[in-house]
Amino acid sequence: MCGRFELKTKFEKLPKVLKQDYPSGLDSKYETQNLIRPNDPVLVIKNEGRIKTTFMTWGFISPWAKDPFSKERPRPFNARSETVEEKKLFSASWKHKRCLIPASGFFEKKYRVRKANYETFWLGGIWSKWTSPDGVELESCCVLTTEPNDLIKPLHPVSYTHLTLPTTLVV
């Protein structure tokens, strides 16, 4: 499971698609992130009629949540690609709200996994928009995971049944 990742890419080296339609001030306030944890803000590309760069909370909040910050209902930060379409929590986002999350590495147990050339890659994800009774909107996302490939399997003991690999994409 991908529970930590990093984005150590400097702003000028980020993929061009991230810099086409981004939040005001991102270029001057952007900082690399050495350790991104669930509930942290993450940089995301989404498509709602046009490709847009934005920040979202990493940890999926359902649109029908009464309290998005409740400690009683943890927010999933991963969704298994094999079952995401079947899960009520994720099915609408799977159909209509997919996203890409830039990363330069992710962590599995005590290992850091990155590209050999240190380039940015993409984690596939889904996102959701929660709206408060007052009309305040909060966007959140989670990373899609899949069965681990032969490079990642050795990073966990055989008894570890939850092992999944973030869905990485080449764009």
Language-model features: locations:
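Conserved small/polar residues in nucleotide/adenosyl-binding loops
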Residues: 161-167
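Residues immediately flanking
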Residues: 103-106, 146-148, 165
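A contiguous catalytic/ligand-binding core that recognizes phosphate-bearing ligands
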Residues: 81-135
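Short, His- and charge-rich active-site/binding loops that engage polyanionic ligands
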Residues: 3-98
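Surface-exposed, gly/pro-biased binding rims or lids
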Residues: 130-160
